[in-house]
């Protein structure tokens, strides 16, 4: 089920727009993704004493794109259903809160459209919540937030591959997350098939 969700995400993404957005938000994205993964893992394991898989799942969802990242990493980790449920529940609750509270904080701090869009894309996990918060703040904030968020979503690919190497048991063969390649194919199909259909229509 989780693998199909990740592939489905690809059908909603435009490859060209995602790569173009990478040039604009790359610095923020790299720092936020790597930093969040490290800090999340450290806090979860050392302070909250959360088990390894749940801590890694929550960190992945926080760093990249919420439930989609958890759905991508879970099968690679061979995470239990209970661990997946806890991670997804945690992320979705935080997203729901962020959707309503971020625009209020943005206005209270008198953030510009660009500042809020960048902040929302980096700090809010799930794509739908980023879009909702951006739209509530303004059209420009929505465009900036969506653009940077696309870049973060692409990190699903290296994250799943790295996870398969890092969490490989001794003597166990590396499990290649093949569904990630279907995610890429879905994104390519959505980009070029839609463009071709649009051109034929005109």
What does each of the following model-derived ranges do?
Residues 28-59, 93-111:
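Transmembrane alpha-helices that form the ion-translocation and gating core
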Residues 13-27, 46-55, 79-84, 169-176, ...:
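Interfacial helix-loop-helix linkers and transmembrane-helix boundary segments
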Residues 138-169:
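Oxyanion-binding "anion nests"
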Residues 23-34, 115-120, 146-154, 200:
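Structural signature of hydrophobic alpha-helical transmembrane segments
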Residues 50-98, 115-138:
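Alpha-helical membrane segments and immediately flanking helix-loop junctions
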Residues 1-2, 197-202:
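Conserved small/polar residues in nucleotide/adenosyl-binding loops
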Residues 15-21, 107-114, 136-144:
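Helix-coil boundary and interhelical linker segments in multi-pass alpha-helical membrane proteins
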Residues 6-11, 40, 158-164, 180-192:
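Hydrophobic core segments of alpha-helical transmembrane domains in multi-pass membrane transport
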């Amino acid at each position: 089920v989780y693998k199909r969700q990740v592939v489905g995400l690809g059908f909603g993404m435009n490859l060209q727009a995602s790569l173009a957005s990478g040039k604009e938000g790359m610095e923020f994205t790299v720092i936020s993704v790597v930093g969040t993964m490290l800090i999340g893992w450290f806090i979860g394991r050392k302070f909250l004493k959360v088990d390894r898989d749940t801590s890694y799942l929550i960190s992945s969802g926080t760093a990249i794109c919420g439930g989609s990242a958890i759905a991508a990493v879970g099968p690679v980790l061979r995470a239990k259903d209970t661990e997946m449920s806890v991670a997804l529940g945690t992320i979705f609750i935080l997203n729901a809160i962020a959707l309503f509270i971020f625009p209020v904080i943005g206005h209270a701090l008198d953030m510009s459209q660009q500042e809020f869009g960048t902040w929302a894309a980096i700090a809010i996990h799930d794509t739908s919540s980023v879009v909702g918060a951006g739209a509530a703040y303004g059209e420009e904030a929505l465009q900036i937030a969506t653009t940077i968020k696309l870049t973060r979503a692409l990190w699903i690919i290296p994250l799943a591959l790295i996870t398969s190497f890092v969490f490989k048991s001794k003597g166990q063969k590396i499990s290649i997350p093949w569904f990630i390649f279907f995610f890429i194919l879905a994104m390519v199909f959505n980009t070029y098939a839609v463009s071709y259909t649009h051109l034929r229509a005109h």
